[in-house]
Swiss-Prot record, chain A:
Organism, as annotated: Dehalococcoides mccartyi (strain ATCC BAA-2266 / KCTC 15142 / 195)
Residues the record lists as binding ATP: G37, P38, S39, G40, C41, G42, K43, S44
The keyword Nucleotide-binding is annotated on this UniProt entry: yes
Catalytically driven reaction(s): phosphate(out) + ATP + H2O = ADP + 2 phosphate(in) + H(+)
Transmembrane segments: none
Top EC class of this enzyme: translocase
Recorded GO CC terms: plasma membrane
Annotated GO MF terms: ATP binding; ATP hydrolysis activity; ATPase-coupled phosphate ion transmembrane transporter activity
Lineage, uppermost ranks: Bacteria, Bacillati, Chloroflexota, Dehalococcoidia, Dehalococcoidales
Key words of the record: ATP-binding, Cell membrane, Membrane, Nucleotide-binding, Phosphate transport, Translocase, Transport
Record Pfam families: ABC_tran
Protein name: Phosphate import ATP-binding protein PstB
Amino acid sequence: MEPKIKIRGVNFFYHRHQVLKNINMDFPDRQITAIIGPSGCGKSTLLRALNRMNDLVSGARLEGEVLLDNENVYSPNLDVVNLRKRVGMVFQQPNPFPKSIFDNVAFGPRMLGITAQSRLNEIVEKSLHQAALWDEVKDNLHKSGMALSGGQQQRLCIARVLAVEPEVILMDEPCSALDPVSTMRIEELMQELKQNYTIAIVTHNMQQAARASDWTGFLLTGDLIEYGRTGEIFSRPKDKRTEDYITGRFG
Amino acid sequence: MLVLLLIIGYIIVRGLPGFSWDFLITPPAGGLAGEGGISSTIVTTLYLVGLTLLILVPVGIGAAIYLVEYAPDNRLTRFIRYGVQTLAGVPSILFGLFGFALFVTALHFRFSILSGALTLACLLLPVLITATEEALKAVPRSYRAGAMALGATKWQAVTHVILPAALPGIATGVILCAGRALGETACLYVTMGGSAAMPESLLSGGRSLALHVFYLATETNAMDKAMATAAVLIVIIVGLNGLTNFISRRFQKRICGGV
């Protein structure tokens, strides 16, 4: 099956500093692909290259191609706003807006021009169900999203992404600010979501990558050292550096 | 704090004997004795502050949004920022002279509420821009990233997420400006004239409350009336400050949880 996203020959620079070096990597459709590596290896940058969030940083420059359904997302006539609707993102720190739970989830659809209250109600309920948050908040939809616990906030952010019906969900260390129980709930949620969505997750937690992902790429100082099935990367790494990293010898 | 209470207390105690309902609703009679009330100056003040905010708020907030959210960090914008900060420190009488030259004379608005309001808007623009800039900068970057990542355009992110989050700070800045407009005299002295008559339109001249205090104190013997007027002014300003506190506290509660 054709991968949902293909990265081909990507070099990435902040000003003169090269962060990613000739990356070639696939993100298979409706699978979870993990990007692992030590801090500063460029894994977040790689993730943000997929929905062009790096564009917001001045001095950022990318060479090569990122193909979403075989269409280069860096081609000049591509609509970035539409791209970000198709490729949603969950951040490291839960970042609900200072609005009610309902308004947080309804934000994306409203930006797309949906105003009918009944339609919004429907979307909000469905998205919160999908994010496994509905039962906890259904009686308090008017409450501020910031009054929730950290884990709930992160699921709210996932619901917010789901509400715009993306095809791909990017997760940038989504559990690093969460306790183990909340982390487990997010990981369970990812398994459910992969029925319908292609997921890319950056994590510095190797157990998480081993538990939760189908494919893994190991990045080291901007080079993709190894990429393959998660089971193989963790049981039979081909590269010495991968082995050293996953066995905890550095990083 | 004690000094502040002493000043306010002194003015209110001195002003109270001259204060009555009649004082509020009769126009000043003029003359050396400073007879009459302050009705026309209250009306002028309302017109003046209202018109000032009407001009000031869209321009000031618009400029701050541009500077914080859109402007690239280059020489021109650094120069603009520097200019804004410098203008905030320029004495108000200089703005008055500028207003006199531009609005009163060159644009033929004469001594009028319009000239006064335009001048005040110029005077307060740096104050409001700075306050709004600070409020916008205090909005976490993660809100911006979150909104953009959901497919919002920059403008949608600004209007739907960033501005609402910055609103308490901006509201505080606006009320601060209203307070400054209430208390300003020097730049109005040379742009509004000193007519004590009831204003007929925005092109009429007039006296704001603060200006009236100045005239009473310097050109008449009616120190008690000056004190009474000052007392009215102070009550309004204290009220405005209370409103500022109330607004920022309520927003705080609404944003950081609770119902």
